[in-house]
């Protein structure tokens, strides 16, 4: 999928703005980042074979700021945390509409010195999965709990709206796939609320997240 030139102009601006931010403003959990060089590409064929997946290069040309990322030790993950984006109701269905939402999330995270979008995967209203931050890097989605923590966000505000059936189905499939890929122990799937002072992932999603730990 190719974005319109105006989108890429805007993305280029965000990239330049992120690079211009002073190092003193980098979040503590990203300050020790050591990820120079090209962004590693992880093999996600095990996901693409099972469900709709859009790779990162399909929705944005903005590259991460590697100096602000932390390389995942041997790509090992021991837990999964589920989120909602929280700030607005989202029912975007077309890929173009979803890309605009993803642009907003990415731009916000760059302005916060995350070095890239903080989540590893994003699930839209139709159940499509979008690759966010490479799994080669620890995420930036739960303050103080990002190491070995794989981050998945569902687009929407689930204090104010209910997740779609397609989103919930995709959440179940995706968590199952990554849990088995990384041998994440049963009982190690959390809502953001379990790890921090927040309502995320919202009252309409959190009970569904809790049930994930009961699945094989």
Predicted regions and their residues:
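Basic/polar, cationic surfaces and motifs that engage anionic cell-wall
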Residues: 2-85, 125-216
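Cell-envelope/glycan interface and biosynthesis
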Residues: 102-106, 110, 116-134, 149-151
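Active-site acidic/histidine clusters and adjacent loop/turn architecture
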Residues: 75-110
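Surface-exposed patches in mature extracellular/periplasmic domains of secreted proteins
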Residues: 93, 112-120, 183-191
């Amino acid at each position: 999928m190719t974005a319109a030139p105006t989108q890429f102009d805007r993305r280029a601006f965000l990239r330049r703005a992120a690079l211009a931010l002073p190092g003193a403003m980098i979040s503590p959990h990203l300050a020790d980042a050591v990820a120079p060089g090209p962004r590693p590409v992880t093999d996600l064929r095990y996901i693409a074979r099972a469900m709709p997946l859009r790779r990162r290069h399909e929705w944005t040309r903005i590259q991460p700021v590697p100096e602000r990322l932390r390389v995942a030790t041997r790509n090992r993950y021991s837990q999964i945390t589920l989120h909602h984006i929280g700030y607005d109701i989202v029912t975007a269905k077309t890929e173009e509409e979803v890309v605009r939402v993803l642009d907003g999330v990415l731009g916000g995270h760059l302005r916060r010195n995350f070095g890239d979008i903080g989540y590893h995967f994003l699930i839209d209203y139709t159940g499509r999965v979008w690759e966010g931050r490479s799994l080669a890097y620890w995420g930036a989605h739960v303050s103080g709990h990002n190491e070995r923590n794989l981050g998945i966000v569902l687009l929407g505000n689930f204090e104010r709206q209910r997740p779609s059936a397609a989103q919930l189905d995709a959440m179940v499939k995706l968590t199952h796939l990554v849990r088995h890929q990384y041998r994440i122990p049963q009982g190690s799937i959390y809502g953001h609320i379990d790890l921090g002072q927040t309502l995320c992932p919202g009252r309409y999603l959190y009970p569904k997240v809790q049930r994930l730990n009961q699945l094989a």
